[in-house]
From Swiss-Prot:
Cellular localisation: Cytoplasm
Species the sequence originates in: Acidiphilium cryptum (strain JF-5)
Sites marked Lowers pKa of active site Cys: K153
InterPro entries recorded: aa-tRNA-synth_II/BPL/LPL, BPL_LPL_catalytic, Octanoyltransferase, Octanoyltransferase_CS
Protein name, UniProt field: Octanoyltransferase
Catalytic residues (UniProt): C187
Its job: Catalyzes the transfer of endogenously produced octanoic acid from octanoyl-acyl-carrier-protein onto the lipoyl domains of lipoate-dependent enzymes. Lipoyl-ACP can also act as a substrate although octanoyl-ACP is likely to be the physiological substrate.
Any one of the GO CC terms: cytoplasm
Record's keyword terms, sorted: Acyltransferase, Cytoplasm, Transferase
Catalytic activity line of the entry: octanoyl-[ACP] + L-lysyl-[protein] = N(6)-octanoyl-L-lysyl-[protein] + holo-[ACP] + H(+)
Listed GO MF terms: lipoyl(octanoyl) transferase activity
Domain spans labelled BPL/LPL catalytic: 40-225
Additional facts recorded: In the reaction, the free carboxyl group of octanoic acid is attached via an amide linkage to the epsilon-amino group of a specific lysine residue of lipoyl domains of lipoate-dependent enzymes.
Binding site for substrate: R79, G80, G81, Q82, W83, T84, Y85, H86, A156, I157, G158, G169, I170, A171
Length: 228
């Protein structure tokens, strides 16, 4: 069925996939939507998904950092970055935007600015749950300080931009099985841990996180999420 493209420049489709989405289907859907956005045939979209247990390798991933995947599937993703884990209890948001034009805080044709926008989006979302997300020099993603010292990663960012249309996106740990991250060296960083909202004592549902993501997206990208 044909979907009309919104003529409102500050509106972005906001879609949520039911159940668990297999990775090859997600990748094919992202690539198709990115091509349609580039051709002016479809609207920009943020797509919220939850995956079955799997590991994805970015373009900088080293084979040695895949330690013991167990029964989880393994994929080469084509996005930037290194290894990460996706699975139940983690909210993945795939972000397909036309970066040839500005989006709120993100200038036109500025990939670094786009990544900074994704960082700000996650930090603002976490603040709504009383969690202080922080950036670290030389380390992509969002970090939180541990009560007993040190720090852990709570959200990952990995994107690809092709002819100024983005795809892939962010992964926020709500209540996943953190033990699964032991199957890899997450993002090539072995000296720091991984955490989640649940591990921090925040009892948030995926629906509550989705609502917070929508509010924060509008603030950062100046684009009203339009449910589809």
């Amino acid at each position: 069925m044909d979907r009309a493209v919104s003529t409102t420049t500050n509106a972005v489709e906001w879609a949520k996939a039911p159940g668990l989405t297999d990775y090859p289907s997600a990748l094919a859907e992202m690539q198709a939507r990115a091509a349609a956005i580039r051709a002016g045939e479809e609207a920009e979209r943020v797509w919220l998904v939850e995956h079955p247990p799997l590991y994805t390798a970015g373009t900088s991933a080293r084979d040695a950092d895949l330690l013991h995947p167990g029964d989880a599937q393994v994929f080469r993703s084509g996005r930037g970055g290194q290894w990460t884990y996706h699975g139940p209890g983690q909210r993945v948001a795939y972000v397909m935007l036309d970066l040839s034009r500005p989006h709120g805080r993100v200038p036109a044709r500025d990939v670094r600015g786009f990544v900074a926008g994704l960082e700000a989006w996650l930090i603002d979302t976490l603040a709504g749950f009383g969690v202080r997300g922080e950036l670290r020099e030389g380390r992509v993603g969002i970090w939180v300080a541990n009560p007993l010292g040190g720090e852990s990663k709570i959200a990952a960012i990995g994107v690809r931009v092709s002819r100024w249309v983005s795809y892939h996106g962010i992964a926020l740990n709500v209540a996943p099985d953190l033990g699964r991250f032991g199957g890899i060296v997450p993002c090539g960083i072995s000296e720091h841990g991984v955490t989640s909202l649940a591990a921090l004592g925040v009892a948030a549902t995926l629906d509550a996180v989705d609502a917070a993501l929508a509010r924060s997206f509008e603030r950062v990208f100046d684009a009203a999420p339009q449910p589809v």
